[in-house]
Amino acid sequence: MSSAAQPRPPGGESEPGPVVVDGTAVFGQDGEEGAPSVPAEARGELLALKSGAAFVCVRPDGDIRAGPVSGEGLYARDTRHLSELRLSVGGRQPVLLSSAVVSGHHAVINATNATLTGAAGTVAQETINIRRTVVIGERLYYEVRLQSFCPSTVRTTVELVLAADFADVFEVREVGRRSGGQTLAPSFRDGRLSFVYVAKDGQRRTTTIGLSPAPTRVDFDGQRGHVVWEVELPPAQPCALCVTVEAD
């Protein structure tokens, strides 16, 4: 598993600007200002990031688990292009330690593992640091970085459950589902996971998700994609799993 340099805004965390990953700017300056158009009752419980006309709202633990009027998700051009993003490590949800919005387009979530039990033995809680970095720009950048402090190598799985419902922001606010249109079966090809919606007027909306490194397997459960990496974590050696989400 490859490691990646920690994304950072240049000049200190308090300054807006491009977030740099492995020496490359993920995106440039923020665009329009203003709070994302999500239900007011949900806004206070979410981390909201914005760049231009795109915005993302995630839970304090970094997950997206969209429900009626929850407002969670990745939005572009008034359409929700990502309605679910759930992380588990070793089949368990990470234990949240802290989360913070570093700038209007950049958030960091720190967590640790729950107790993991498997054929190789038990990994005690608070053995693995799990750091999520969320950056919104022309695309969504989502990194899961793991670092084990167990004295021996830990072998475990990392899973992301992903889905896109393509609801528009007015339906999210008012609770409902658009009539007409068709959600096609998700697919995985050439290292990319794709979700496609064809509106009643024939317009196509697509969510394309890049995964690096290549996952061990990708399974489907209806409109959900289950992405699984089998990872080895030597003591103190970081492992980075990177997800990019593009909305068309």
Predicted regions and their residues:
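Terminal accessory carbohydrate-recognition/targeting modules of carbohydrate-active enzymes
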Residues: 2-248
